[in-house]
Every structure is written in structure tokens, then in C-alpha cells.
From Swiss-Prot:
Subcellular location(s) of the protein: Nucleus
UniProt source species: Pestalotiopsis microspora
Molecular function via GO: DNA binding
Purpose: Transcriptional coactivator; part of the gene cluster that mediates the biosynthesis of dibenzodioxocinones such as pestalotiollide B, a novel class of inhibitors against cholesterol ester transfer protein (CEPT).
Any one cellular-component term (Gene Ontology): nucleus
Name assigned to this protein: Transcriptional coactivator GME11369
Record carries keyword Transcription: yes
Length: 449
């Protein structure tokens, strides 16, 4: 506190007050019929504005907290986060959240009996999570427990709970093995010399997770990527596609678009609504998982109107295998929302470039669009954006012992994909605002004579 900048403090407080007023005004526009809680009846534009205001408020509040914190505050917050993670893991393991009704409070004793857990343990855990807005013990009903808007979403959208369990069961224990990993393996580049290997006591790299028989783990990993590591990827990758201009050819045309190595059909569904004449082929990554192609990521809503009335075909295709669709207008390889290439970024990209080389040579009107996170050449984003970049980098290091590719490395991989007649070439590029993601439009180019 000795070096507190009063000017910055005043500005920060004013910003937070202004953002709070704006959010309150936006919320007053929402009907009082329950839509304010679920956001399910709010117009997309208003929902987007409210989300942006919430994110701005969280960023400003975080900045204010960092300005005034003392070492004990920092340590107490660390301890609180550690206990919060442990409590949510406990609640999930004993399915406590599912036992609590969404619309009313119930005695803690009843829930403890249903879940066969000690009442005293449950009571203490609820009191801790309630400090973070997750579950509550209503003041007028001591000894009762009820959901909050936050905890409710972990029941209605189970992928949030899957992400939390991956964090508790694997990501956090793995992160805590970094010290031992460095002492034992030093700068070894081997995917088998990661913090993940130390935490799990295995020599198999994290990429072999797909060979694991744990359906739960293979469901939790995509959820963790979606909600934690790549939380902004879908919107940013769609923005990059638009910025690149490669979607213009779809307006009013009967064209085929192939999404290579997808996690689900969600983006194809969005594009199918926007381009009603286009056909889509979604090629899911990874091996088949019991439960069908949707296990790794939703649709539903009657499988999104039976995949927009037949214009979307979903199949599985192994990385680098021959591309069975030879006359598509666009092949979209979006690494920004994939499973971080399963720890083999260069091998993954090279294999897919090679698999599409002949197709692009034989059909010069076709393009491959590659979207990927990259190592930013500069660090000019907000603290929140810096945080996400660091999370991705550490996730790659701890789980895979790998790192993201730089723009230069990515460009070289593309240019070096060649045959006797020519090579792949980047014809257009678009960077994200923070330059930590890029979209590249790739065509086949004949060798110069």
C-alpha cells in the first residue's frame, strides 16, 4: 500500500461505478419473467452487451483488487481458491449438486442422507463455496442449502462440471509437479517427460489419453478446453474467418465446406443458418467414443433440427488420413478449438497439410483455411488476455511438454509442404487483435520456372 497510485485508484473506482450503472440499465431492459436469470429470452445483441459489461466489470474489479492487496491478502486468496476447488470436487464426486432442487432450499441433513455423506462435512463445504457465490445457506433458513444462479448452471450444463473435475483431478495436480519435472528432466523436449507424466506416474504421453478406457476423462478434457483454456476461441475464430474474407464465396452459392478435425458440429450449424445454400461436412477428431459423435460436444435441440435438415454430414477422420472429399470450396482446419493438437502441433499441422496437398493442386479454386493460436510476437493485450495466453502456454508445457508454434514456424511448415510441381502458399492472413491467434488462407502454387 506504500506505493498506491491514488490517480489510478480513483480512475479504477470511477470505471467500476460507470460499468455497474451501465449493467443495471441494460438489465432493466429485460422482462421480469425469469429471462434475467437464464438469459434465454434476451435478444442476442443485448445478451452480448451484458456479457461484455460483465467481463469489463470483472477485469476492473480484478485490477482494483491487485492495486490494494497485501501479501496476506494474496496468500489468503490462494488458500481460498485451493479450498474452493477441493470443495467443488467433493460436491461433484458425491453428486450433491444434482440432489439439491433448482427452485427451492432443502435441509442440509436431507441432502447428506441422500448422498451418504456426513452432515457436518457438507455443512462446512457449503459455507466455503457460498463465499464464492456457489450454493448458499439462506439467512432465513439456517441449516438449509439452495442453488445460486452460478451453481445452477453446473447442473443444467454438465460440461461446466466436467471442466471443473478435469481441473481438480488432473490439471491442478499436474501443475504442482512442475518443480519435480524440471529437476528430473531438465529441458528434455520429449512428450513423455512432462509434469503430466510425473503426476500420473506413467511413461505414456498425454496424447495417448485417447487410448485410455476412461470415458470420463475423454469427456472432461474437451470441456476443460472449451470453458477454460480456449474460452474465447469460438468467437475469435469465427471473427478471424470473417476478417479473412474467405466466406464471401458462399453467398448464394451451392458449395461444400469441410471442417477438419472438429470437436463438434456447433460451428457448422451456425454457418448453415447463415449460408442456406451451402453443404457442410464435419470431420470429428479422435477415435469413436461410446455414446455417439456428440459425446465430445453438444448439439441437441433435436440434434439441432437434425443437422439443419440434412445439409450437415458428420463423420470421423483420423489426423493426416486421406481426405475423402475432393471438391469442397473450403477446408477449415481450426486448431484454436481442437484438443491443442494432442501435444504434437508440428506433426499434426504437417500431417493435415500433406493430406490436403493433392486436393489443392487438382482443384485450384479450393482453399485450406488454417486457424491456430500462436506465440504472440508482442505482449500488448489486456491483463485478462495475457492470462489466457499464459494459461494456454502452461497447459501445453505441463500436459504435453510442448509449446505453441510461432507465426514464422507455421509459415515455414506451410511453404515446405510441396511436391515436384509446386507447394502450398499463404495468400491471405488475419491476426486477432492480441496477435495470439491467426487465420491463414492457403492455396497450391506451382513452382516458378
Amino acid at each position: 500500500m506504500d506505493h498506491l497510485d491514488l490517480t489510478q485508484l480513483t480512475t479504477c473506482v470511477s470505471d467500476l461505478a460507470a460499468q455497474s450503472s451501465s449493467l443495471a440499465a441494460k438489465c432493466h431492459q429485460i422482462d421480469t419473467n425469469g429471462a434475467s436469470r437464464t438469459m434465454d429470452k434476451v435478444s442476442p445483441s443485448l445478451a452480448r452487451e451484458i456479457l461484455q459489461l460483465k467481463e469489463s466489470m470483472a477485469a476492473t474489479a480484478g485490477k482494483l483488487q491487485r492495486m490494494v492487496q497485501e501479501p496476506p491478502d494474496f496468500l489468503q486468496r490462494l488458500a481460498h481458491q485451493a479450498q474452493l476447488l477441493a470443495c467443488i470436487q467433493w460436491l461433484a464426486e458425491f453428486q450433491i449438486l444434482a440432489f439439491i432442487p433448482l427452485d427451492r432450499s432443502v435441509p442440509i441433513e436431507d441432502i447428506a442422507e441422500l448422498a451418504s455423506v456426513p452432515k457436518e462435512h457438507l455443512s462446512r463445504i457449503v459455507r466455503l463455496t457460498a463465499t464464492a457465490g456457489f450454493l448458499q445457506e439462506p439467512p432465513s433458513e439456517m441449516g438449509h442449502v439452495a442453488h445460486t444462479p452460478l451453481s445452477t448452471q453446473f447442473v443444467t450444463e454438465l460440461s461446466y462440471l466436467d471442466a471443473a473435475m478435469f481441473l481438480a483431478d488432473l490439471a491442478a495436480p499436474t501443475a504442482l509437479q512442475m518443480t519435480k519435472t524440471t529437476k528430473r528432466f531438465g529441458q528434455s523436449p520429449s512428450p513423455s517427460h512432462s509434469a503430466y507424466n510425473m503426476a500420473r506416474g506413467t511413461a505414456a504421453p498425454f496424447a495417448n489419453m485417447w487410448d485410455d478406457h476412461s470415458i470420463k476423462l475423454r469427456r472432461q478434457w474437451p470441456a476443460y478446453l472449451k470453458h477454460v483454456v480456449n474460452s474465447q476461441a469460438k468467437s475469435s475464430s469465427s471473427d478471424l474467418l470473417e476478417s479473412l474474407g474467405c466466406m464471401d464465396r458462399l453467398q448464394g452459392a451451392i458449395q461444400c465446406i469441410v471442417e477438419v478435425g472438429a470437436e463438434s458440429a456447433e460451428r457448422a450449424i451456425l454457418l448453415a443458418r447463415r449460408y442456406p445454400s451451402a453443404q457442410f461436412a464435419v470431420q470429428l477428431s479422435g477415435p469413436a467414443i461410446p455414446g455417439g459423435v456428440w459425446t465430445a460436444g453438444p448439439p441437441d435441440q433435436a440434434q439441432k433440427e437434425v443437422l439443419i435438415a440434412g445439409r450437415i454430414d458428420v463423420s470421423r477422420r483420423a489426423v493426416g488420413s486421406p481426405q475423402p472429399i475432393s471438391e469442397a470450396a473450403l477446408y477449415i482446419l481450426d486448431l484454436s478449438i481442437s484438443s491443442l493438437n494432442l501435444g504434437q502441433p508440428k506433426e499434426h499441422v504437417s500431417a493435415e497439410l500433406r493430406a490436403h496437398l493433392d486436393i489443392l493442386r487438382l482443384n485450384r479454386n479450393s482453399a485450406l483455411v488454417l486457424i491456430s493460436f500462436i506465440l504472440p510476437d508482442t505482449r500488448t493485450g489486456s491483463l485478462e488476455e495475457e492470462t489466457m495466453t499464459s494459461l494456454r502456454e502452461l497447459c501445453m508445457l505441463q500436459l504435453h511438454n510442448q509449446q505453441l508454434l510461432s507465426f514464422k514456424e507455421l509459415s515455414e511448415l506451410i511453404h515446405n509442404t510441396n511436391d515436384r510441381m509446386g507447394h502450398l502458399s499463404v495468400v491471405r492472413e488475419a491476426f486477432s487483435g492480441t496477435r495470439d491467434a491467426i487465420a491463414l488462407e492457403i492455396h497450391y502454387q506451382a513452382h516458378s520456372v
